């Protein structure tokens, strides 16, 4: 402080030789006051910048938390959907294997009937031990009387009905 007042005195003496000590004290006090106000204003601006930075970081944290929550929700939904589709795929794979096995068995039966068809009588093929169809004049079966082809339990006597796959909702 002594250096600033001595500097001021040297400059004031160059102004005209007015060496009034009260004037120099007033100007030094006014400079101190201005510097103090300037420092306060600078500190206030610094605090405001710091607070704005903290507020910006808080807003960024909130935004990232929301994004993280949305991603976790999306991941949960996707995982549940994946598990559901995987379960359906397992059921469909099991049904496909079952149907493939049935198809293979039916193809083996067809191959057996076709390869040994001449050796089997019709009564052996229909599974009942007899043939209730009548042979017409031309040597072909006469199926005009359809009631003779129906058994008393409500089904056809013939066993070559298609085999249906189990329904997915049956389990």
UniProtKB/Swiss-Prot annotation:
| Originating organism | Arabidopsis thaliana (Mouse-ear cress)
User: What taxonomic lineage is listed for the species of origin?
Assistant: Eukaryota, Viridiplantae, Streptophyta, Embryophyta, Tracheophyta
UniProt KW Nucleus keyword: yes
Q: Which residues form the signal peptide?
A: none
User: Subcellular location, in the record's words?
Assistant: Nucleus
Its quaternary organisation is: Forms heterodimers with BZIP9, BZIP10, BZIP25 and BZIP63. Component of a ternary complex composed of BZIP2-BZIP63 heterodimer and KIN10.
Predominant cellular place of this UniProt entry's protein: nucleus
**Bias (Low complexity) ranges:** 1-24
**Keyword Hydrolase (UniProt):** no
Q: Which UniProt keywords apply?
A: DNA-binding, Nucleus, Transcription, Transcription regulation
Q: Which GO terms describe its cellular component?
A: nucleus
State the function annotated in the UniProt record: Transcription factor that binds to specific DNA sequences in target gene promoters. BZIP2-BZIP63-KIN10 complex binds to the ETFQO promoter to up-regulate its transcription.
Specify the protein name.
bZIP transcription factor 2
Q: Where is the bZIP domain?
A: 29-92
């Amino acid at each position: 402080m002594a250096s600033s007042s001595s500097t001021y005195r040297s400059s004031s003496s160059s102004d005209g030789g007015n060496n009034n000590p009260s004037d120099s004290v007033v100007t030094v006090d006014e400079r101190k006051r201005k510097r103090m106000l300037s420092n306060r204003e600078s500190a206030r601006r610094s605090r405001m910048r710091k607070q704005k930075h903290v507020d910006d970081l808080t807003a960024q944290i909130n935004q990232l938390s929301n994004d993280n929550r949305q991603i976790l929700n999306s991941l949960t939904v996707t995982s549940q959907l994946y598990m559901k589709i995987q379960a359906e795929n397992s059921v469909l794979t099991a049904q496909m294997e079952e149907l493939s096995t049935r198809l293979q068995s039916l193809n083996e039966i067809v191959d057996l009937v076709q390869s040994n068809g001449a050796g089997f009588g019709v009564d052996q093929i229909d599974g009942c031990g007899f043939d209730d169809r009548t042979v017409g004049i031309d040597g072909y079966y006469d199926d005009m009387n359809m009631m003779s082809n129906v058994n008393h339990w409500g089904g056809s006597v013939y066993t070559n009905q298609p085999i249906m796959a189990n329904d997915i909702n049956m389990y």
